[in-house]
Design a protein with these regions (language model features):
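Short phosphate-engaging motifs
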Residues: 131, 171, 230-234
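Hydrophobic packing residues within well-ordered alpha-helices of enzyme cores
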Residues: 113, 135, 164, 234-238
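Short, glycine/acidic-enriched loop or turn micro-motifs at the edges of active sites
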Residues: 69, 104-106, 129, 155-157, ...
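Conserved acidic-Pro-Pro-aromatic motif
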Residues: 52-53, 117-124, 207-319
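S-adenosyl-L-methionine
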Residues: 1-128, 133-206, 215-217, ...
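Short internal loop-to-helix segment that lines adenine-nucleotide cofactor pockets
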Residues: 77-98, 178-245, 257-260
Length: 319
């Protein structure tokens, strides 16, 4: 019996006080397990159960849990399955920076960078409407809705409206259907019933070059990009951005995602090489040159730095 049902029975006088205490205690014990995880996880401070939702508080940000998803950002941070890259990212961001968070999801990276760089200008882009509302909700929760400019849109090699495939776990939304059926399952919120879902929706997209021109962006220092395989198309729409503004880029590149778009991640490396960039992985807070991805590659996140513009950063963090 669920705790809420038990509560209703007690309120209706159908369960005695002592039986209610006993059964309620059994259902509240998992809170102690959550407390133990928080104690072990140095990044997490507490979990707050509120009237308007459940909130994870970290050292610097707050995120709503979304248990309608079978996995959510707050959850992965709490249980410690997601590494914390924001601190290292921050070292490549100068004072007064302009930052693009492409594929912002519910705002974990945007919020982390906003707290670390209070004098920055941050643009957060999320094309899926439901996820975008989660982004706005978390920005308001942290009081960062003015600092972080949220845009309901994505980027591609062309402008227009494109079809996105959105599984039940909408963080895996993509311009090509995913093949991992784990993300199809809806969050059961403890109800014990999981259904598969994959929807097709239309979302607005633009090119990097067009957006920068239309919004008169004169400076761009850092781009974080996570678009579930569309990274090559995102970057190919920013030729002038990478030739002229030359931001540091931190991006996900996975062979399995790229394959759904009929390209190999090495094509991204070649493209950036043509713009004067080098590709790097990171280890022990150092940049490691990375030339070519093959079947033995285990890294999934990569930095691109321009050889001339970012010479000082390369000297400081190069291996």
């Amino acid at each position: 019996m669920k705790l809420e049902k038990l509560y209703d029975l007690y309120e209706a006088g159908k369960v005695s006080k002592r039986l209610y205490w006993e059964l309620a205690r059994e259902r509240l014990v998992p809170l102690l397990e959550v407390q133990k995880i928080i104690k072990k996880n140095p990044y997490c401070k507490n979990v707050e159960i509120r009237e308007d939702g459940i909130v994870l508080k970290t050292q610097d940000i707050e995120l709503f849990f979304d248990m309608t998803q079978n996995i959510c950002r707050a959850e992965t941070i709490l249980i410690g399955t997601e590494g914390e890259e924001i601190d290292f990212m921050s070292r490549f961001i100068p004072a007064g920076a302009t930052i693009f968070d492409i594929g912002a999801n519910v705002g974990r990276v945007s919020l982390g960078l906003a707290k670390a760089h209070e004098d920055s200008t941050i643009y957060a882009f999320e094309p899926v409407e439901e996820t975008f509302h989660g982004l706005e909700k978390n920005l308001r929760l942290n009081g960062e809705e003015e600092h972080v400019k949220a845009y309901h849109m994505g980027f591609y090699s062309e402008s227009g409206d494109l079809k996105f495939f959105v599984p039940a776990a909408n963080e895996a939304a993509s311009l090509r259907p995913i093949t991992d059926t784990y993300y199809f399952k809806e969050g059961d919120q403890g109800q014990g019933e999981c259904q598969d879902r994959l929807e097709e929706i239309v979302c607005p997209v633009d090119t990097l070059d067009d957006f920068v021109e239309k919004h008169d962006v004169k400076r761009l220092d850092f781009i974080k990009c996570d678009t579930e395989g569309a990274e090559k198309m995102v970057f190919s729409g920013g030729i002038h951005v990478f030739r002229d503004l030359r931001p540091v880029v931190y991006t996900e590149m996975l062979r399995k995602h790229a394959a759904r778009f009929d390209y190999h991640p090495n094509e991204i490396i070649e493209m950036f090489t043509g713009w004067g960039y080098g590709c790097y992985t990171s280890e022990n807070e150092k940049l490691i040159p990375f030339e070519k991805m093959d079947e033995s590659t285990t890294e999934t996140n990569f930095f691109f730095l321009h050889g001339e513009k970012h010479r000082e950063l390369l000297e400081k963090y190069g291996d």
